[in-house]
């Protein structure tokens, strides 16, 4: 089964980055939140917008327009477990180019879909582009609210913040050992790797610069409690965009600690001559355990990576990997999503976009099974999919995956088996 949320804004690019659906209206169904960060106001200002749709009916529950000129409000839209105390999920929306004191420092705002009101607002004052990436961090201060890791990668070196989910205040700031740039471009929550009982984090800097100015690309694993560097990796070929995407992976080497996926999708390869790569590193030792390459140069393989559940029945969570610029025949940037066994590396299935230039697989997130059967589901974005004759609108498709032992004998669901859409 699949369901579709279609954008409505011409060139709005619905779903640049979105989080796992959560129930915001109390009907027992997980609802979908996403933004169209390029929505125009006053003809030229890319203020952006964000909205929440019912997971049951597809009806729009709440929508907001960005209020900061050119701020890209809706660049990230993250559903978060109850922040306001009303028992319902709320949303955090990023406007990473929102002006503060005349600079594009960025603003993060938490809002209630139930009332539409602002719960808190945090404006960056030190670095720039606050909210370029963010992820749920768990409850680090014991106040019963989910906190957030938030990247602000621009400025001299970039920063990552641990923000209090209740009021948006800063609990901790993470900075790199050296000011090499773009630290915080991507952040990922990991398991507890240093044994202190708290979830740790991975940070990417795909446009870090060496002393001679050359792009290198870096990734770190940090202790969330102390900020101590646990692991560090880099890539000398700056074309690869190493560290542009990170993800937690199941334990593959048997040491009881989860691993880390670091992508090198080739985002800085303007000629599109190199294939993207995904590398899996040990969370315990930092040693490289796996390395997979895309099927063609320039497809942005591993532009998105997410755990997809155990699809092959081997007891290890497998991966969904996006390649949004995949060429299918003569159609460019159709996009594809690859389902790959984390243990064996075997490709279990592939899905493809509808047409040229729809960028299928740009962003992917896990989702609850809308049918309540406990099967893994994925929400997949086609960032530039046309809608009703309008270009670069964007759509989100929800797919329910069938494991290898489903009662009906069918394997992993494919895109061709879509049965219903939400418009």
Residue ranges and their predicted role:
Residues 1-13, 32, 47-72, 91, ...:
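Blade-edge motifs of beta-propeller repeat domains
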Residues 37-38, 82, 96-97, 139, ...:
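Flexible loop residues that form catalytic
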Residues 38-43, 97-101, 154-157, 207-212, ...:
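Short glycine/acidic-enriched loop and turn motifs that connect beta-strands
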Residues 9, 25, 68, 84, ...:
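Surface-exposed coil/turn segments at beta-strand junctions on protein surfaces, enriched
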Residues 26-35, 85-94, 142-151, 195-204, ...:
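Acidic/hydrophobic-patterned starts of short beta strands in beta-sheet-rich repeat architectures
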Residues 16-26, 75-83, 132-140, 185-195, ...:
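Beta-propeller blade termini
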Residues 13, 27, 45, 72, ...:
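A generic fold-level signal
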